[in-house]
From Swiss-Prot:
Keywords from the named record: Cell cycle, Cell division, Cytoplasm, Cytoskeleton, Mitosis, Nucleus, Phosphoprotein, Repeat, Transport, WD repeat
Annotated WD repeat ranges: 37-79, 84-114, 125-157, 168-206, 215-255, 271-301, 310-346
Assembly and oligomerization: Interacts with NUMA1 (via N-terminal end of the coiled-coil domain); this interaction promotes spindle formation in mitosis. Interacts with NUP98. Interacts with MYCBP2. Interacts with USP11.
Signal peptide interval: none
Compartments, record wording: Cytoplasm; Nucleus; Cytoplasm, Cytoskeleton, Spindle pole
Protein name: mRNA export factor
Organism: Rattus norvegicus
Primary localization class, coarse: cytoplasm
Protein family (similarity comment): Belongs to the WD repeat rae1 family.
Keyword rRNA-binding: no
InterPro entries attached to this UniProt entry: G-protein_beta_WD-40_rep, WD40/YVTN_repeat-like_dom_sf, WD40_repeat_CS, WD40_repeat_dom_sf, WD40_rpt
Single Gene Ontology MF annotation: ubiquitin binding
Amino acid sequence: MSLFGTTSGFGTGGTSMFGSTTTDNHNPMKDIEVTSSPDDSIGCLSFSPPTLPGNFLIAGSWANDVRCWEVQDSGQTIPKAQQMHTGPVLDVCWSDDGSKVFTASCDKTAKMWDLNSNQAIQIAQHDAPVKTIHWIKAPNYSCVMTGSWDKTLKFWDTRSSNPMMVLQLPERCYCADVIYPMAVVATAERGLIVYQLENQPSEFRRIESPLKHQHRCVAIFKDKQNKPTGFALGSIEGRVAIHYINPPNPAKDNFTFKCHRSNGTNTSAPQDIYAVNGIAFHPVHGTLATVGSDGRFSFWDKDARTKLKTSEQLDQPVAACGFNHNGNIFAYASSYDWSKGHEFYNPQKKNYIFLRNAAEELKPRNKK
């Protein structure tokens, strides 16, 4: 059966090509607008794995829905299918073969969405909202890892209603990432734990947070041999930490940098400081993107410790981001991120997902 079977798309929005969008402050970078974007804040984005031909994009939103688009080479986006939770969708991920999508929600459940049949079934249950979800593909097991505000990390065989394993967290799970054989989980009260996933998941190390404020997002990075070797951690205080697991020189190799602040990083002038909402590493170059509540995205070279690019300011926060499997497309979501609370939420404000050609802008800075 073909991917998505015979499911119909959603919405009736038009499509646009690379470089043909209008120039206003909702899209100052003139990037491609994804058609039929969600009707409420977009919390998460994820592109399909390289095992699938073509590119498919998943987004979860505070309208309780999960949407899937096909992204064509021209930049045109085609709505393919949609599923619902009974609460906001906080995280999404793909199975390694691209046949399933996993979704985590405030309704305290996680679901598995079979894209061939367009059927979704519950695969996980927590006692509080499920904040993170990741697929783990090990040589001897496959499972889904869910992190929750109930202070647990659970591992699920999708064929069973009971977890394979439950690990207690020191606090509520705020963000997580997985690249086998490594997982990292950041919690409330600045908790930070690295797990090793070989044979079976187990705690590897607790790390004193390099950041002084609440953790917001985390992404694992790889070395030149394509092995996970460290992570980038973002906070609500406009700062990112680059942390290696086993660096030759910790004091020199680990560092933090300021980002998503007004007036650049000139500390002599008063600054508005914004949350870092998302971090994504380029799958080819190893450079990274950050997105923030200031309504900008930035590209960075962590090895050269330099900024490659900062976008113009959008008229609302950039809430999530991600690269496709070969790094040619950068997706970012423009919508309210709740960083200023409910009183600043405007339900009339449209939400957008934009696609940008990322092939050139993420190339690392030449070494002198």
